[in-house]
């Protein structure tokens, strides 16, 4: 046995501390858990503090650059000084700013609405529901009214063509019959309206198709015989002036194909950014718009050398010196690659055609002057 008396106080404490575990182990070995005085060894859980998660703040995108003040003042003056109802809008595709004058009023689109038909067709193509090489034979039963140059190509067995060619004619020549064929091919007006809604294009309406739209604007009920020759013009001329005036005014006041200049400019910006269609369909549509043969003295008349411009025009019916819709919308791209979308919609005016074109060209000139 160790004699503790020979140890210092510190040594005694260390020795006892060393024996203590062995003594406890001995007790555990020789004493049954059922013995009197048994104290169970508690189980200790180690609890680590859990830090409170700190939420990561959502980054706030910087506001878009301000639009050029000179551009805003110019289009505001152009709109206010023009004799008629006009809406003007310009959007920067790259910088995101927009300017407008009377840009929230719905104006008659007329053939500008062919853009939404074309986009719907190309959206169907992107989904694999059709191809641009799908065949179609145009017959006299397909004819509509007004501008339809494809009518001269229809023979005894019709005119065999493709969806691609119908699209090209509808966009570059504004052929009404080709456009109405495409409209029916994708399921009618509701399919185009669905595309506009799915893509959230805003204040853009799509009308009932060329035949019903033009008949309603004139005050007529559509008949297919109106598609031949000048039958539509003759039927319209036979109407009482009061009937024509009422129908004309009703159309301008609440056009079933009405759209705002702001919505159109922003939709074209989405198209250019590739947000509406596949890359291939986007490129095809913009290239086709750039090869348009219509409206050379509208917006295009002020496009400088070295800039590119793809567009779609729209022209409504005349009555008593007034025109219900004289429009041009498009995508203007500078030599450095920056793009702007422009929409000029003249909903009702008695100004001469050169005066209307001068207004449109002044808008383009201001965009170019404020480009940097």
Where do the PLM segments sit?
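Active-site-proximal helix/loop microenvironment
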Residues: 204-280
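Active-site-adjacent loops and short helices of periplasmic peptidoglycan-processing enzymes
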Residues: 30-221
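Short, flexible turn/loop "capping" segments at secondary-structure junctions
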Residues: 171-174, 243-247, 337
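Carbohydrate-binding/catalytic loop surfaces
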Residues: 159, 220-228, 309-316
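Structured C-terminal helix/loop/strand segments within mature extracytoplasmic catalytic/sensor domains
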Residues: 2-5, 28-76, 184, 189, ...
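Hydrophobic membrane-insertion alpha-helices, especially the h-region
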Residues: 18-22
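C-terminal motif of bacterial Sec signal peptides marking the signal peptidase cleavage site
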Residues: 24-26
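Bacterial N-terminal signal peptides that target proteins for export
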Residues: 3-16
């Amino acid at each position: 046995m160790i004699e503790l008396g020979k140890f210092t106080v510190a040594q005694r404490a260390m020795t006892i501390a060393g024996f203590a575990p062995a003594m406890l182990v001995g007790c555990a070995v020789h004493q049954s858990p059922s013995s009197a005085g048994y104290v169970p060894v508690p189980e200790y859980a180690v609890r680590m503090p859990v830090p409170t998660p700190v939420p990561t703040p959502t980054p706030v995108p910087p506001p878009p650059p301000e639009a050029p003040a000179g551009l805003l003042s110019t289009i505001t003056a152009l709109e206010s000084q023009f004799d008629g109802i006009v809406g003007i809008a310009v959007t920067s595709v790259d910088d995101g700013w927009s300017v407008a004058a009377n840009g929230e009023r719905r104006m008659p689109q007329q053939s500008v609405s062919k853009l939404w038909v074309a986009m719907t067709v190309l959206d169907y193509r992107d989904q694999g529901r059709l191809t641009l090489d799908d065949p179609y034979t145009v017959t006299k039963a397909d004819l509509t009214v007004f501008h339809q140059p494809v009518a001269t190509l229809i023979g005894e067995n019709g005119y065999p063509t493709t969806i691609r060619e119908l699209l090209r004619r509808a966009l570059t020549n504004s052929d009404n019959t080709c456009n109405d064929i495409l409209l029916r091919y994708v399921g009618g007006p509701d399919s185009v309206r669905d595309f506009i809604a799915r893509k959230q294009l805003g204040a853009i309406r799509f009308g009932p198709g060329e035949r019903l739209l033009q008949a309603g604007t004139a005050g007529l009920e559509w008949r297919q015989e109106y598609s031949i020759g000048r039958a539509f013009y003759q039927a319209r001329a036979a109407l009482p002036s009061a009937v024509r005036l009422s129908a004309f005014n009703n159309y301008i006041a609440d056009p079933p194909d009405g759209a705002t200049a702001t919505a159109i400019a922003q939709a074209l910006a989405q198209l250019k950014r590739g947000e509406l269609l596949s890359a291939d369909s986007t490129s095809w549509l913009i290239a086709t718009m750039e090869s348009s043969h219509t409206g050379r003295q509208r917006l295009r008349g002020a496009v400088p050398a070295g800039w590119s411009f793809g567009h779609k025009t729209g022209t409504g019916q005349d009555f008593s010196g007034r025109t219900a819709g004289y429009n041009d919308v498009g995508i203007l791209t500078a030599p450095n690659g920056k793009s702007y979308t422009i929409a000029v919609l003249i909903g009702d005016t008695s100004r001469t055609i050169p005066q209307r074109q001068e207004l449109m060209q002044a808008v383009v000139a201001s965009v170019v002057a404020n480009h940097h």
